[in-house]
């Protein structure tokens, strides 16, 4: 397992919902990654929908797959 120093965190937008709690996420740099939900998000029943801004954790060994570790709050004024 990679230590926390080796992990890369990036923000992105969910563009597609796939079976088994998998999501296609477009990162800030334009790349798309396949991401699954972390255990804490699953345990707290946080819903991830299309268009949500999320923080994705990537390992330097495989930059095509990641883990959604945080769903950013939407601005409540809009």
Curated annotation (Swiss-Prot):
Give a Gene Ontology cellular component term annotated to this protein. cytosol
Is Protein biosynthesis among the key words of this record?
A: yes
Physiological role = One of the essential components for the initiation of protein synthesis. Stabilizes the binding of IF-2 and IF-3 on the 30S subunit to which N-formylmethionyl-tRNA(fMet) subsequently binds. Helps modulate mRNA selection, yielding the 30S pre-initiation complex (PIC). Upon addition of the 50S ribosomal subunit IF-1, IF-2 and IF-3 are released leaving the mature 70S translation initiation complex.
Q: Tell me the compartments it is located in.
A: Plastid, Chloroplast
InterPro entries the record matches: NA-bd_OB-fold (IPR012340), RNA-binding_domain_S1_IF1 (IPR006196), S1_domain (IPR003029), TIF_IF1 (IPR004368)
Q: Which HAMAP family match?
A: IF_1
Q: Which residue numbers delimit the S1-like domain? A: 1-73
By what name is this protein known?
Translation initiation factor IF-1, chloroplastic
What UniProt keywords apply to this chain's record, in alphabetical order? Answer: Chloroplast, Initiation factor, Plastid, Protein biosynthesis, RNA-binding, rRNA-binding
* Gene Ontology molecular functions: ribosome binding; rRNA binding; translation initiation factor activity
Pfam families registered for this protein in UniProt: eIF-1a (PF01176)
Task: Identify the NCBIfam families for this entry.
Answer: infA (TIGR00008)
- Keyword check for RNA-binding: yes
Per UniProt, subunit arrangement is:
Component of the 30S ribosomal translation pre-initiation complex which assembles on the 30S ribosome in the order IF-2 and IF-3, IF-1 and N-formylmethionyl-tRNA(fMet); mRNA recruitment can occur at any time during PIC assembly.
Task: Give the main localization category.
Answer: plastid
Which PROSITE patterns would you find in this protein's record?
S1_IF1_TYPE (PS50832)
**Entry's family note:** Belongs to the IF-1 family.
Record-linked PANTHER family:
TRANSLATION INITIATION FACTOR IF-1, CHLOROPLASTIC
Q: Which gene encodes it?
A: infA
